UniProtKB/Swiss-Prot annotation:
Chain span(s) of sequence motif DEAH box: 347-350
Reactions mediated catalytically: Couples ATP hydrolysis with the unwinding of duplex DNA at the replication fork by translocating in the 5'-3' direction. This creates two antiparallel DNA single strands (ssDNA). The leading ssDNA polymer is the template for DNA polymerase III holoenzyme which synthesizes a continuous strand; ATP + H2O = ADP + phosphate + H(+)
Chain positions recorded as [4Fe-4S] cluster binding sites: C239, C256, C265, C304
Location(s), subcellular: Nucleus
Gene (UniProt): CHL1
Sequence similarity: Belongs to the DEAD box helicase family. DEAH subfamily. DDX11/CHL1 sub-subfamily.
Name of this protein: ATP-dependent DNA helicase CHL1
Primary enzyme class: isomerase
Listed GO biological process terms: establishment of sister chromatid cohesion; interstrand cross-link repair; mitotic G1 DNA damage checkpoint signaling; mitotic sister chromatid cohesion
Molecular function in Gene Ontology: ATP binding; ATP hydrolysis activity; DNA binding; DNA helicase activity; iron-sulfur cluster binding; metal ion binding
Organism of provenance: Eremothecium gossypii (strain ATCC 10895 / CBS 109.51 / FGSC 9923 / NRRL Y-1056)
Source organism superkingdom: Eukaryota
Amino acid sequence: MGRCEFYHPFTPYRIQLELMQQIYGLLESGKKMGIFESPTGTGKTLSLICSTFTWLREHKAGYLQGSTGAQDSEEDSEDEPAWVKENYEQSVLADVTASMRAYEQRLAAVDTDLLVKGAAKRQRVEVAVERPDDGAEFLPDAYHSDVEERPSHAGGRGQLRKQLDADIKRLLRKLDEPDAADKSRLAANPLKVYFASRTHTQLGQFAAQLRLPQFPPSLAGLEQERVKFLPLGSRKQLCIHKKVSKVKSDGINEACMDAVSKSECSFFSAAREPDIIRQFQDQAFSTIQDIEDLVGIGNTLHACPYYSSRELIEGAEVITLPYQHLLLENARKTMGIDLRDSIIVIDEAHNLIDTINSIHSASISLTELRQCKLALQAYLAKFKTRLNSGNRVNLLKLIKMVDVLSQFIETQYKNGKRINDPNDIFMGTSMDVVNIHKLEKYMKTSKVAYKIDKYIQATTSNDLQDRGSRDIKQPILFKVASFLKTLANPSEEGQFFFENGHVLKYMLLEPSEVLKSIVTEAKCVILAGGTMEPVNDFFTQLVPYLAPTDVTTYSCGHVIPDDNLNAFIVSENFEFTFANREDIALIERLFHFIYQLASRVPFGMVVFFSSYKYIDFVVKTWTDRGLLSRLDAIKRIYHETSDGADVLKGYSETIQSEKKGAILLAVVGGRLSEGINFENELARAVVLVGLPFPNMFSGEMIVKQQHIKEKVIRNGGTQEDVNKAVREFYENICMKAVNQSVGRAIRHASDFANVYLIDKRYSGPRIQQKLSDWVRKRIQSASNIPKILSDTEAFFSGKGL
C-alpha cells in the first residue's frame, strides 16, 4: 500500500491516487524521468500538482538547511563532534524558520487592494514625446562596421555613460538599504517545480487548479506557508507599454529592447528599483496570481511585469512557463532560469518531439525572399541619405544575401533534396558563412528588421503597390533574420533540404540533444499527457542515453466505468490504403455504414479523415451521387475546411436545437482534433476513417526517412532493420494522431461514447498495441457490420437514449 495523503482538494478517484503514488515514488527513487499517460477528464493536472508539491514541501527543509550551511567547509565539519554538528544544524534551521515566519507575516499583511486604491496618487505618468513626422522612428541606430559599440564615438560614450550612471545609482540605493538583500533571501527557495505547457490557456488552467489544494508548511515551526507561484510569460503577454504592446509578436522583442536602450520605457526603469521589486514580489506571492494578475500588479506599480517577474524566479516554488522558455537554452539563460535539482513537468508531452523539432527549425520560401528584397529596396530608397555608411553597406549586403538564396532555390530546387554542406549555397558567389555571421550580428544589433517592418506596415506608398508587393506588409524580415541565424549556426543534428513549394528548410533531426541538458541538470523530468502511446518514440528519439531502469512509465485507466465506452473495429471490406482510398466502391461502402450508424447514434457524431483533400474528395463523391443529401436528412452535415472557417459553432447549435443531431467531418491533426473537447452530446460517437499516415513523399518525410536509414546502418543494422525502423516511425506518427483524435470523445467521469475504427488494419496486433490502453481494453469482439450496428443500438438504449 503506497502513500495515501497528497492534500488533494477532493476525494481522489482510485486512478488519481495511483497516479500520484507513481509520481511521488518516481521522485523518491532518484530516477531521471517519468512518462505518464492520464486521459483527459481524469484530473491529471491536480494529480501532478498534489504529488510533486507534496514531495517538494516534505524535502524542502533538508535543502534549506543544506544551502544555508554550505558556506562551511567539509574539512571544518569533519573535525567537529556529532553533537556540535547537530546543534549547529538546529540553529541554522531555527534561523531559517524565523526568517520564513517573518516573511509569511509580511505577506499576510499585504493588502492586495491597497496598491490599486492608491495607484492614482502614486502612479507616474508616462508622457508621450511628440516627434516631428520625419521618419526618424524607422531609422536604426548608427552601425559601425561589425563592431556593436565604439567607445571612441561620442554617441556611444554618451549611451554608455547613461547606462553606467543608472547602474551606479541602483548600487547606491542598495547600499542605502542594508536589509534589502536579507529580505530577498527570505523568499529564496532551493527546490522548484517547473510546469511547461503548450498554450497560455493551459498554463492559466494550471494556476486555477493550484488554488484548490492546501499544503502544509515545509518546516514544523511554521504555522502557514503560502505557495510561492510565478507564471512566466512572453513580452506579448506581459508588456504594458502603450506603443510596444501593440507591436506584432514577431517584432515585440526588438521593439522592447529599442525602447529600453533609448530610455523610453519608464516601466523598465521602475522594474530595476529594489523597493518596487519587493512590492511586486509581495503582491505576486501573497496569493496565487496568473499572467493577467501580474499585468495588473505591473500597471498598479507602474513597473514592467515582464522584467519584474524575472526577478522573482529565485523566490518561487512553482513556476509555469511556455515550452519555448524551457526548451530553448538561450531563453533559459536570458530569463535566469536555473534547473538544477528542479522537478520539470512537461504537460501535453505527446507534442514534445514535434515541438522541439519545430522551435529549432527554420524555413524560407522563394516568394518570401522576393518580398523581402522589395521591402529592403523600398526602405533603402526612402532612407538611403539618412543612413550612416555602416547601415547602408550592411543593407546592401543583406540584399545580396537574399539574391544568393533566391538564386540557389531557383536553380537547385527539388522536393526532398538535401543540402549536406551549407557552403554549397554560396558556391560561385562572393558570399560565405562568415558573411552570414556578420549579417546575423548586424540584424540583431541594429534591430533593423523591426525598423524596416515598422516602416513597411506604416507606409501607404503607391510605389510599393506598383511593384507588385501586395503582401509586403507581412513581417517577412523577421523570418529572414531567423533563417540567417540558423544558417550561421546550424546544429550537427539538423539538415538543410528543399520542401514542396520552393522552400529551403532547416530541420532538427535529433531532438534528444535539446532535452539532454535539461535532463542532466534537473532532479527529474516528468512527461505527462492524455495520449502518450506509443511511448517507445520517447525512448528512441528523446532519451536514448537513459537506461530503461532510469525511466518510469505508467498509463492509468480512465475514470469512466467500463460500460461507458465501446470501441469497434469495422474491418469488413474496408482498407483505406494510399492505392485504393479513392476507389468509388469503397467510398460508397463508407457512406452506407455512416448512414446506418447515424440513425442509431443520438446527437453528435465526429468523423475523422486523414486530410482536408480527402474530406473534399469524399464529400464531392457523395454529392455527385446524391448520397450526401440522404445523410443530411438524418443528421445535418458540417465539415472542417482548410481555410479555417469556424464550423464548430453551427455544429454545436444544431445539436442543441435539432433533435436529429449533426455530423462533423474533421481532419486528424487539424484544429478540431487537437484543441476542441467534444464532451457529452457533441460526440456520442467518434469515427476514424482509415489510418492517417503522413505523406511519405513530402520533403520532410523523405529527409527523415533517409536519416533513419543512415542512423540504422551506421549502428550496424541491416536493410531489414532499416525497413522495420522506418515502418515503426510512420506507424508511431499515425497512431499518436489516432489516439489524440479518439481522446476528444470522453472528457469527464460520467461521459459516454462509442469509437469506430474503420479499416481492417486496425485488427492487426501491432497497430492495436499502439492504441491508448483505455481504448484498447474496450475493443469489442463484434466484427461484422450488422452486429456492430446492433451493439450500438443496445449501448445507447442502455443509456436511456
